[in-house]
């Protein structure tokens, strides 16, 4: 093979069954509408189980009672997860009140789950409530289109309330990119909103009739914050500002964290720098990256289909040149940018427009009324009186944005009375887990239900070694698909089996290095024993300001991952 093309541009071979399903779906319609009327089962059937994902839903069941129901010869208790499309995480208080009501009245679990992709999910929607949820979202100007499956998913944007002008500009671009890359099929409107079938033929000028080979994730990032974890994403626009005003973006392509246990052809990968582009080329470049991946991505193997694998197969320079050709531009050299952190600043922060922003820590993003901590009711009360908006962060927290000085005390009173401002340790603020059991069908080990007590134990270790005012970026994900973004943490736990995890070390605080597996298939006591020893060493031996992940690399405890496509599994 020549240097120019390390591998073929298009992978030949038998297409996956998902490709057949998309082709035969009549632009994502399938027989979803007919399935909705089938009262004999609580779930969708056949291809529709996968097709509903394009409409923002996953079919799930309660795994806590799966075996019990099987013994009783009952089908699993099917219910849908629905994920809203919410570019940049901004939601109005009117929209919040509508979703609060729906969650309370029409879902099994009664909760709103904030996700690390800056949106919210409902868990436990019975089939009879599926159409009503889409109609409720539509009535307040929201939808769930393209938040799952082989499309451009929810577009993230740094939650930067301090520089309001820059955030407003970046947020507008996140919305524009999201709209530009949406599917054009009318299937969503016909099925869920009862809109008339139009005589014209469906066309998908950007995504194509069989859509993308695999999921595709996009971010807009405002340095020095990397709160959206750009290296977990396929396409990233890093905001470059002059005098506080947005002038263009650095483009980074080909990040992604999902792996498969034991499959060395899979790897987490940091995104590659392509170059700088002025603002006016943003949509053309976004489209060019997506269509290049559409045409070159591997449709014969879904485990090798993401943009990161395409880049490694054809070479970064070849992919970049094709994007330039399709967009009709030449990238300029990357402009300087630097990341200093990725956590949220919990509490009140004053923006440059003299408004205040209150960032509330929501453990694991789960909003529910707990005994003595009515979080859900408290947020509803704030939504009723707050004139600004709410912003969901990529750390699963919530910002009450744009609070005038005169309203501060009123909002703080509700937040405190509801347990929304309870003091937590820096360690808890910088820890995160995906949903996992009982609803996720892919879960191998607990994550969300495991994290709170696990962090209690970590807090005890931090106190024992005199570093309780410090933090380690710590994440738990229930399976190697990696929704909890453990593969960008300083300490990442990846679920292997019930009660067992792979322990990864050596990421860094700012999320620019992939961690390496340190110990495999170990239990919580074994994890804590390892971390006890390592935290003690870090506390005693670290250099000034040295994070835990950087220390583990410098001290030779773990080798850094330099080229994950080739050395992640070594």
Curated annotation (Swiss-Prot):
InterPro entries: CysI, NiRdtase/SiRdtase_haem-b_fer, Nit/Sulf_reduc_fer-like_dom_sf, NO2/SO3_Rdtase_4Fe4S_dom, NO2/SO3_Rdtase_4Fe4S_prot, NO2/SO3_Rdtase_4Fe4S_sf, NO2/SO3_Rdtase_FeS/sirohaem_BS. One of its GO terms (cellular component) is sulfite reductase complex (NADPH). Siroheme binds at residue 483. Keywords: 4Fe-4S, Amino-acid biosynthesis, Cysteine biosynthesis, Heme, Iron, Iron-sulfur, Metal-binding, NADP, Oxidoreductase. Its EC number is 1.8.1.2. One of its GO terms (molecular function) is NADP binding. SUPFAM superfamilies: Nitrite and sulphite reductase 4Fe-4S domain-like, Nitrite/Sulfite reductase N-terminal domain-like. The keyword Chaperone does not apply. Pfam families: NIR_SIR, NIR_SIR_ferr. The keyword Transcription does not apply. It comes from the Bacteria. Disulfide bonds: none annotated. [4Fe-4S] cluster binds at residues 434, 440, 479, 483. Binds 1 siroheme per subunit. Binds 1 [4Fe-4S] cluster per subunit. It catalyses: hydrogen sulfide + 3 NADP(+) + 3 H2O = sulfite + 3 NADPH + 4 H(+). It is an enzyme of class 1 (oxidoreductase). Pathway: Sulfur metabolism; hydrogen sulfide biosynthesis; hydrogen sulfide from sulfite (NADPH route): step 1/1. Its cofactor is siroheme; [4Fe-4S] cluster. Belongs to the nitrite and sulfite reductase 4Fe-4S domain family. Alpha(8)-beta(8). The alpha component is a flavoprotein, the beta component is a hemoprotein. HAMAP family: CysI. Component of the sulfite reductase complex that catalyzes the 6-electron reduction of sulfite to sulfide. This is one of several activities required for the biosynthesis of L-cysteine from sulfate. This is Sulfite reductase [NADPH] hemoprotein beta-component. It comes from Shigella dysenteriae serotype 1 (strain Sd197). The lineage of its organism: Bacteria, Pseudomonadati, Pseudomonadota, Gammaproteobacteria, Enterobacterales. The gene is cysI.
